[in-house]
Amino acid sequence: MRIGHGFDVHAFGGEGPIIIGGVRIPYEKGLLAHSDGDVALHALTDALLGAAALGDIGKLFPDTDPAFKGADSRELLREAWRRIQAKGYTLGNVDVTIIAQAPKMLPHIPQMRVFIAEDLGCHMDEVNVKATTTEKLGFTGRGEGIACEAVALLMKAAK
């Protein structure tokens, strides 16, 4: 078994909506990013890549490459997952924690779980997504951006 951890953060800027966990969420602010700014899928992709010792999202999809400008993070997750499967790994489970004062994530979490399960080709019970605040402390608490952490458990596929 192999465990990976991922972290991502994006500052608010411009106009909304935002995309988190593949879900378009109405909000007055947008997120500043080279791709679509999906902190949940970026952290998750990093966790999966880390567990497979394949580097990170920036190595695989560099923000200096114009090909990834405005990229759909679900597509990036699916491509990373293909590479991980090619190394002979299967998914144990993933756990994602979104850290944001606003907007409220709870109404969107069920759809995030559906999208992640679809993208990883796994069962819903292998995907957990939750959200928390920092009780108005730090940059997320001041409403300056959103952060996310994720962990992933991979196992070698049976031969």
Curated annotation (Swiss-Prot):
Cofactor note as given: Binds 1 divalent metal cation per subunit.
SUPFAM superfamilies: IpsF-like (SSF69765)
Pathway(s): Isoprenoid biosynthesis; isopentenyl diphosphate biosynthesis via DXP pathway; isopentenyl diphosphate from 1-deoxy-D-xylulose 5-phosphate: step 4/6
Binding of 4-CDP-2-C-methyl-D-erythritol 2-phosphate, residues: 8-10, 34-35, 56-58, 61-65, 100-106, 132-135, 139, 142
Site location (Transition state stabilizer): 34, 133
Residues binding a divalent metal cation, per UniProt: 8, 10, 42
Cofactor: a divalent metal cation
Coiled-coil segments on the chain, per record: none
Protein name: 2-C-methyl-D-erythritol 2,4-cyclodiphosphate synthase
Organism: Salmonella typhimurium (strain LT2 / SGSC1412 / ATCC 700720)
